[in-house]
Amino acid sequence: MNFIKDTLEKIIKDALTQLEYPILENVEIVRDSDRPDLSDFQSNIAMALAKQLKQNPRKIAESIVAKIDTPEITFSIDGPGFINIILSNEFVAKILNENVSRETFNPQPQTNPKKIIIDYGGPNVAKSLHVGHLRSSIIGEALKNLAKYKGYNVIGDIHLGDWGLPMGLIIASIKEKGLKLPLSIDELNPIYPEASKRSKVDEEFMAKAQEETKKLQNGDKENREIWKSFWTTSVNDIKKILSILNVDFDLWYGESTANDDVNLLVKEFKEKGLVKPSEGAEVIDLKDFPMNGTEVPPFIVIKSNGAVMYGMTDIATLYDRIKRQNADMVWYVVDARQALHFHQVFSVAKITDLKGDCQLEHLGFGTVLGQDSKPLKTRNGDNVSLMELITDTLDSAKKKIEENEKTSSLPEEEKNKIAKDVGVSALKFADLINPRTSDYIFNLDKFVSFEGKTGPYILYTAVRIKSLLRDAGNDFEMGNIALANVYDKALAIKICEFNNAVDRAFEARGIHILAQYVYDLAVCFNNFYHNVKIMTEENVNQKNSWLKLSKIVLTIFETFAKIIKIDIPERM
């Protein structure tokens, strides 16, 4: 919903109806002006109608404008038939006062909300979090909170990689070395990389790891105790790191949670005659489910060595989400390079009648790149540690706080808190301002800047408003908003776009739409702030009106902060 655009569209639609012109579907009736210096909005509807009716577009535009009688809005015709729309301050203020209050930005409850389970984060137990987990965690958390804001019943599930051969490799190493449990995270982290590397050249060790895996999956008490011990150590470390980014989950389920369902589903699929032998393996054929017009390989249920393929874990997890948790939608916020895998999983869910009416979506995302435009790596070619990335960002933010004369003399504890707020906003906004499916280059100096399209710029603008409102007190709460110039009018128009930005972001599963809106709002507010002398205004009603307008902008920033999970400090 865009309060102003919706009103303008209704006015033009009423004129079209009176003229007996058709209402064209999928044609934008009112759009932002291509020349904001000439008009607030424009309509190209006459051009679209001219094509269908084979009439002169300017004459159509003239007939539309002639039917409109709204003194507070000026409609004029430009060029071959473009309709320019200029709004009076009184009209914009009226729309704002009738439709916008602080409550407008509260979560939008639904009577019978659908249930969405969002699968994001997806780290592997006993492996260090790396930069690859950054996007899934940040995007997934924001989408979860956006869906909650829209009134859906939302569950966030981290879906840990905590089962299969990697666990057997770790257990085999722990037993062989006689390591005493519980292990610290520093003791645990090197075990899997070393064991994995060794298993590729040591057949005896690989056989031992496979044996330990089988024992674990069959419920062996000793292996379950070892697994639970390092699982707990690893998960506590994951929670610690992700909490810095204000990322949390409703469910800490993993592949292990689905273990009991895997064999039952394999048996069921076989009984239905869906599983066929293929080159020593057992598969479900997907030739009738092409991806982008291309035939996809079959879904492997059981490998040639008799082991159940990991894709069946995703099927078993989906079974739990649909049949037990009653999900109406399941979103997978996972690397775009996993598109084929999820196409296969979703296809199997259809073939086996598991899917039902549940809406399945793979919300793929692009890659974080280094300055060389290649996937971000260390100098040695390894994955960049997520904790290292976070630490570098917070350190860089702290340096900015130390260099700022407004904050350099603050108590150390407060400076650290501000640095965390700034650093986390820098990381999150830098990611979320990009379309989800796009790659982006990691540029720390740019991300922590207080200028430009950055998280710190958004925070700085919000803090500026907080300071303004503190200086003003609370006497401005009463009364309607009145607009007096082009700056407050532009800000009021931008405020009215908030709900539309939320709706578009949700429909596209694209937080970048909302992030771009909030950045544009910040630019608009700062333009207003620098050109309108709020605190020295002698007209008390006008001053209070501007303060109320500022408070609404702050409320939008606070709402956005709750959605992407960043904190706005009191000063910076």
Predicted regions and their residues:
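Short, charged, solvent-exposed linker or helix-capping segments at domain edges/interfaces
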Residues: 94-99
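Short, basic, low-complexity termini and linkers enriched in Ser/Thr/Gly/Pro
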Residues: 100-111, 478
